[in-house]
Design a protein with these regions (language model features):
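Amphipathic alpha-helical segments within well-ordered protein domains
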Residues: 25, 44, 48, 63-66, ...
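Acidic, PIN/NYN-like endoribonuclease modules and their adjacent C-terminal/linker elements
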Residues: 1, 98-146
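Short, well-structured N-terminal submotif of metal-dependent ribonuclease cores
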Residues: 1-35, 50-63, 68, 125, ...
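Short, conserved active-site loops that position catalytic residues or coordinate cofactors/metal ions
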Residues: 37-45
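Acidic catalytic patch
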Residues: 60-87
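Residues that scaffold the ATP/ADP-binding catalytic core of kinase and kinase-like folds
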Residues: 11-12, 46, 118
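Short beta-strand scaffold positions
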Residues: 4, 35, 73, 92-95, ...
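Alpha-helix capping/helix-boundary segments
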Residues: 8, 39, 78, 96-97, ...
Length: 146
């Protein structure tokens, strides 16, 4: 199995370099390819903010990527959940953080206007909370060395 970096996938989807585009297509079509979730996160950023692609097109590219035969995606279920959350208005990076935190009791953020409010409206789990100065944050106690 071979892992790919973001630039291989960017060239495949953007087709902005004919030679590298063909090579990247050959790499992906050969199969036995591993895509780390950090590469998917970076690809979303490159497509949206560097290549200035609309969000729906970017999400379609990511959905296409994870559905390709011969492609193994790290934590695929988290990527799929992040895509669903993102299509409902959550920023992709935040959506991926939320999906990766599925076993936690809550996600803490200072982004009240965007992330926390949207997540609450969508009733996403774990709940996304904004900690306040008045709120008591439970502290874990460490076992003492004896």
């Amino acid at each position: 199995m071979r892992a790919v970096d973001t630039n291989i996938l960017a060239r495949f989807y953007l087709r902005d370099d004919a030679v590298q585009g063909r090579i990247s297509a050959d790499v992906l079509s050969a199969g036995d390819v591993f895509v780390p979730k950090t590469v998917i996160l970076e690809l979303e950023w490159v497509l949206r903010y560097v290549a200035d692609q609309p969000e729906d097109k970017v999400l379609d590219c990511l959905a296409h990527l994870i559905a390709l035969p011969g492609i193994t995606v790290e934590d695929r279920d988290e990527i799929e959940a992040a895509l669903r959350h993102c299509r409902n208005g959550i920023d992709f990076a935040d959506a991926l953080h939320l999906a990766a935190s599925k076993s936690c009791s809550e996600v803490l953020t200072f982004d009240d206007r965007g992330y926390a409010r949207r997540a609450k409206k969508l009733r996403l789990k774990p709940p996304v909370q904004v900690p306040t100065a008045k709120q008591q944050i439970p502290r874990r106690t460490r076992p003492t060395d004896s």
